[in-house]
C-alpha cells in the first residue's frame, strides 16, 4: 500500500529517495499516466445501450449513429436505430430506416423483427406478420424477436401475443430489461393492468433503477392508483435527484381530483 503523505523536495536527495520509497520506488515522472479514454465503436455502443436503458431514446439514436461511423455493417447499431425511432413514435421513418439497413444485412433476425414492429405500428399488419415469421426462422432464441412478435400480434388484436411475451420472459427470466420492454409494449396498446404487472416484475429484478419506478408510477397513475403512484415517483426522485419527470409527475399527481381516480377504477375493471 502506498503511503499518503505531503512532502516537499527542497533539493535534498535523501528526501527524494524517501519519496520514491513511499511511492513504491517511482517518482511522479516515472509513474504511468492515466489511460486516455478511447472513443471507439465499443465505447459508443456501450453508451448507446446505457442511454436506451435510461429511456433516453433520442440520445441513443445519435449514439448508434456514431457506432455506424466506425462500423457501417453493425447489425446491432442499425437495429438499435430502428428501435429508437419506434420508441419515439416515428414509425414510418423506422420502416424506411429498416429497409435501408436490410439492404446491407438482409438476414439479421432482430433487424427483421424491428421492421415487423415498424410495419405493424404503421398499419401494414400482413407485412408485419411476414417479417416476424422471417425473424423467428432466422433466430428463435432471441427475447427481442419474441417481444417484436407480441407487438405485431397485439397490433393485429390476436390473443397469441400473450404466449409470445411469456416466451420472451422465459428466454431471459432474470432480465429486468426484457420485462421493462414487455411492459412498454403492453402500455402502448393500452393494456395497463398487464403492463403494471411487468413493471412490478422489472422493479423486483432491479429496484435501484429510477426509470422503472418512474414508469411504474405512470402506469399506476393511469389506473387511478394515486397513493402507489406517489410512492413510485418519490422512489424515482430519490434514486435520481436530477430526474425532472419525477418531480413533474408528483406535481401533477397533487392536482388530481376524484375524476381521474374514478376513470382509473373503470380502466382497471375493464382491463381484467
Segments (PLM) and residue ranges:
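TPR/TPR-like alpha-solenoid helical repeat scaffolds
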Residues: 151-155, 218-221, 243-261
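TPR-adjacent "capping" and linker segments in tetratricopeptide-repeat scaffold/adaptor proteins
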Residues: 22-43
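Structural signature of tandem alpha-helical TPR/SEL1-like repeats
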Residues: 54-62, 88-100, 122-134, 153-167, ...
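Helix-start (N-cap) detector for alpha-helical repeat units in TPR-like alpha-solenoids
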Residues: 41, 75-76, 109-110, 142-144, ...
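Alpha-helical adaptor scaffolds
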Residues: 117, 144-204, 211
Amino acid at each position: 500500500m502506498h503511503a499518503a503523505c505531503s512532502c516537499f523536495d527542497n533539493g535534498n536527495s535523501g528526501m527524494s529517495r524517501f519519496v520514491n520509497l513511499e511511492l513504491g520506488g517511482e517518482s511522479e515522472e516515472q509513474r504511468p499516466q492515466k489511460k486516455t479514454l478511447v472513443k471507439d465503436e465499443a465505447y459508443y455502443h456501450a453508451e448507446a445501450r446505457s442511454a436506451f436503458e435510461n429511456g433516453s431514446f433520442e440520445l441513443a439514436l445519435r449514439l448508434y449513429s456514431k457506432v455506424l461511423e466506425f462500423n457501417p455493417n453493425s447489425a446491432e447499431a442499425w437495429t438499435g436505430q430502428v428501435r429508437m425511432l419506434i420508441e419515439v413514435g416515428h414509425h414510418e421513418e423506422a420502416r424506411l430506416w429498416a429497409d435501408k439497413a436490410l439492404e446491407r444485412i438482409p438476414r439479421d433476425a432482430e433487424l427483421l423483427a424491428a421492421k415487423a414492429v415498424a410495419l405493424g405500428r404503421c398499419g401494414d399488419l400482413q407485412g408485419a406478420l411476414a417479417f416476424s415469421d422471417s425473424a423467428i426462422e432466422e433466430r428463435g432464441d432471441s427475447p427481442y424477436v419474441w417481444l417484436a412478435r407480441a407487438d405485431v400480434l397485439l397490433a393485429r388484436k390476436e390473443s397469441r401475443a400473450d404466449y409470445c411475451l411469456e416466451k420472451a420472459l422465459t428466454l431471459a427470466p432474470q432480465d429486468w430489461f426484457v420485462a421493462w420492454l414487455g411492459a412498454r409494449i403492453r402500455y402502448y396498446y393500452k393494456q395497463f393492468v398487464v403492463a403494471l404487472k411487468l413493471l412490478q416484475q422489472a422493479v423486483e429484478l432491479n429496484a435501484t433503477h429510477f426509470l422503472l419506478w418512474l414508469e411504474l408510477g405512470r402506469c399506476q397513475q393511469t389506473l387511478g392508483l394515486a397513493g402507489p403512484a406517489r410512492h413510485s415517483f418519490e422512489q424515482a426522485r430519490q434514486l435520481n435527484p436530477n430526474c425532472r419527470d419525477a418531480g413533474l409527475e408528483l406535481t401533477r399527481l397533487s392536482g388530481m381530483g376524484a375524476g381521474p381516480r374514478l376513470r382509473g377504477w373503470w380502466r382497471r375493471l375493464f382491463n381484467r
